[in-house]
């Protein structure tokens, strides 16, 4: 149906992740397709997938295809317009339009902002070197898998659940892995000190080296990452450095549009 003659309101969804698509699934169950013409804009060049299972892809237990939640056919069958690999860069509330990185402009009647979060990055030198990545999306996992095939030594910065999953996955892929954690024990937000120590001993027996009480001062290297320098003088050689120190909500787009934000969109 032509957009200009479609009597339904246009619902634009910014974000093609789990939260946004779960909302659309529920809307469709309530006959939302009769009321709304739905368009989804995603920054990643992929359909919706289960981000939680990226660690299983890294470890070799699943493929990327196996963690897809909504296939291209699902979008088509439900009459959903999908734009991937083209992040929304601005919301114009006055004229009810959005603009994407490629310059595309789309009008809306209703707007759902489901932009998720992004990895935290410590303010240290060397973050931009080749061989440094986060552990947040498919592109990050692809970088890590390539490194595992061509390089030998990995350093993971962050001793929470995500960092441990990254370390274990890279170990399963045959890399020598060291993990740097700022705190004295692992997963201190979930485990007490004795439990964190037990976990560390178990993973140490499995071949992962640990540098606790480790404040990262610099990622060294000239043309690519070569190692991690800690503030106390310890140095860890590395061909790959993975940042896994947490996430923060993607609120910039909403804030720039004049919406109330705090630690998320209010």
Model-derived features: positions:
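Conserved phosphate-binding and hydrolysis motifs of nucleotide-dependent enzymes
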Residues: 15-20, 116, 158-163, 233, ...
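Beta1-alpha1 glycine-rich phosphate/pyrophosphate-binding loop at the start
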Residues: 2-81, 169-191
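Rossmann-like NAD(P)H-binding beta-loop-alpha module
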Residues: 143-191, 225
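A general structural signal for well-ordered alpha-helical segments in protein cores
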Residues: 20, 51, 55, 68, ...
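FAD-binding core/adjacent interface of flavoenzyme oxidoreductases
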Residues: 1-12, 69-155, 229-231, 242-244, ...
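Residue-level detector of alpha-helix initiation sites
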Residues: 18-21, 45, 117-119, 139, ...
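A Rossmann-like FAD-binding core segment of flavoenzymes
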Residues: 37, 82-99, 106, 173-265
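Short, hinge-like loop/turn segments at secondary-structure boundaries
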Residues: 55-59, 130, 151, 155, ...
